Swiss-Prot record:
The gene is gatB. This is Aspartyl/glutamyl-tRNA(Asn/Gln) amidotransferase subunit B. SUPFAM superfamilies: GatB/YqeY motif, Glutamine synthetase/guanido kinase. It comes from Borrelia hermsii (strain HS1 / DAH). It comes from the Bacteria. The lineage of its organism: Bacteria, Pseudomonadati, Spirochaetota, Spirochaetia, Spirochaetales. GO terms for molecular function: asparaginyl-tRNA synthase (glutamine-hydrolyzing) activity; ATP binding; glutaminyl-tRNA synthase (glutamine-hydrolyzing) activity.
């Protein structure tokens, strides 16, 4: 049996705007329950919505970043369904005329770049949040602080063919939205949520069949998403072998994911679009966007996106794929690197220092690069001391620790503590001769082919110079003297 896994993703991104989508309530995470509500987001009679202009601007910017076609007419619809956390009895969304459609992004996979097509991006408001307490209390609470929060939903084509590709796609989307400062995209806080649609395209005797689509919900991490897709692939394959159920006969159903057991669990048959009874929202007029306005959003707000940055960093600085992927995980980290590399003769070594020493400090302190106390110029200056041979790598690490404590440049510490590397060959030769005279047994061991004797003598040279001697020069002179013994 030949088959191909088909995965489509519906991603909800809560935008980091100051106010909600259709009212003036503050758009923040957390806080006292029901403290950021008004008659509009609570759906009280007579309250009328008004469109947050920044919601539309954000959608346009997202459309540009995903190579989408952007509509000139914005229409909002009412999506009707009954649920306790939906106070109006409908959600303001977009049905048949999403603001963006026919887009695409590229993802990075183990076999290279892959194009993932995007069906649509539409604007909508979030619902409230239901809080289910212990069964013994026999009650639930609703927090409407989130009701009306501005959302973009990004729907992909089923172009994703593995759990690994799904995670790569989500990573790419999250990076794009973070680079554009549209959202913090925190799965933990619910500002980046994803529903996964999975089925199989099976080929038997040149006849194609599609298995029923499983929409998997309640996925709270990229790890869970990958596990759910991998499990659903094996489950649908087995079910096809046993029951040969097709999409035409069953349609679509909703599944949950049990994190503890690592399996998907059937929840319900999926409603059709008609169940939502979409109508145009009579309280929100059509909004016309001319081409000049749409392009102005791009020219004023678009930044270099992560994939483009990675390609440029490789070409401009000769960095490895690992380096550029790590650096571009945070646009502020890229900025820090480029400011340091700008004045350095060895950008690759600057990258190594940032990805090892600087990131280690950030992780230990649990801070971002924005809170790091050393400016990029200090890292560049320290690297230049290493490149020029004025300090060794070992001494540089000690200098770096002192820089962290005192917030001063490496030059100040080097001058104060007389740490500049000794590169005077005449002086080094005198130290080497002194070590040879003091260690005749090591010379004999060297003559017998014992390599550890060289390491011992180099250690003695370093000890006598407090680690300041140029190790390459010292090793060269030592080997020359040993050959003459």
């Amino acid at each position: 049996m030949e088959y191909r896994l088909l995965v489509g993703l519906e991603v909800h991104v809560q935008l980091g705007l100051k106010t909600k989508a259709f009212c003036g309530c503050k758009n923040d995470f957390g806080g006292i329950p029901n403290s950021r509500t008004c008659p509009t987001c609570l759906g009280l009679p007579g309250a009328l919505p008004s469109v947050n202009k920044e919601l539309i601007n954000s959608a346009i910017l997202a459309g540009h970043a995903t190579n989408s076609k952007i509509r000139n007419i914005v229409k909002f619809d009412r999506k009707h369904y009954v649920y306790p956390d939906l106070p109006k009895g409908y959600q303001i969304s977009q049905n048949d005329a999403p603001i963006c459609n026919n887009g695409f992004i590229f993802i990075e996979t183990s076999s290279g770049l892959k194009k993932i097509n995007i069906v649509r991006i539409h604007m909508e408001e979030d619902s409230g949040k239901s809080l289910h307490l212990l069964e013994s209390e026999n009650r639930s609470y609703i927090d409407f602080n989130r009701a009306g929060a501005p959302l973009l939903e990004i729907v992909s084509e089923p172009d994703i063919n593995s759990g690994e590709e799904a995670v790569a796609y989500l990573n790419s989307l999250r990076e794009i939205f973070r680079y554009l400062d549209l959202s913090d995209c925190s799965m933990e806080n619910g500002s980046f949520r994803c529903d996964v649609n999975v089925n199989l395209l099976i080929n038997e005797n040149d006849v194609e069949y599609k298995t029923p689509i499983s929409e998997i919900k309640n996925l709270n991490s990229f790890k869970s998403i990958k596990l759910a897709i991998d499990y659903e692939e094996s489950r649908q394959k087995e079910e096809w072998i046993l029951h040969r159920k097709t999409f035409e006969s069953i349609g679509k159903h909703t599944m949950g994911f049990d994190d503890k057991r690592g399996i998907t669990v059937f929840q319900r048959s999926k409603e059709t679009v008609a169940d939502y009874r979409y109508i145009k929202d009579p309280d929100l007029p059509l909004i016309k966007l001319d081409d000049v306005y749409i392009e102005s959003i791009k020219s004023n707000k678009m930044v270099e996106l992560p994939l483009d940055t990675r390609i440029r960093l490789k070409e401009q600085y000769g960095l490895s794929n690992f380096d550029v992927v790590t650096l571009t995980s945070d646009k502020n980290l890229v900025k820090y690197f480029e400011e340091a590399a700008m004045t350095s003769s060895d950008p690759k070594r600057v990258s190594n220092w940032i990805l090892s020493e600087v990131l280690s400090v950030l992780n230990d302190r649990e801070i971002s690069i924005l809170d790091f106390n050393l400016p990029p110029s200090y890292i560049s200056e320290l690297v230049e001391f290493i490149v020029s041979g004025k300090v060794s790598g070992k001494i540089a690490k000690e200098i770096f620790l002192e820089m962290l404590k005192r917030n001063v440049s490496p030059a100040i510490i080097i001058n104060e503590k007389n740490l500049e590397q000794i590169s005077d060959k005449s002086f080094i030769e005198s130290v080497v001769l002194e070590v040879l005279n003091e260690n005749p047994k090591s010379i004999e061991l060297y003559k017998k082919g014992k390599s550890h004797a060289i390491k011992f003598m180099m250690g003695q040279i370093m000890l006598k110079t407090s680690g300041r001697v140029n190790p390459a020069f010292a090793n060269e002179i030592l080997m020359n003297k040993l050959r003459d013994v």
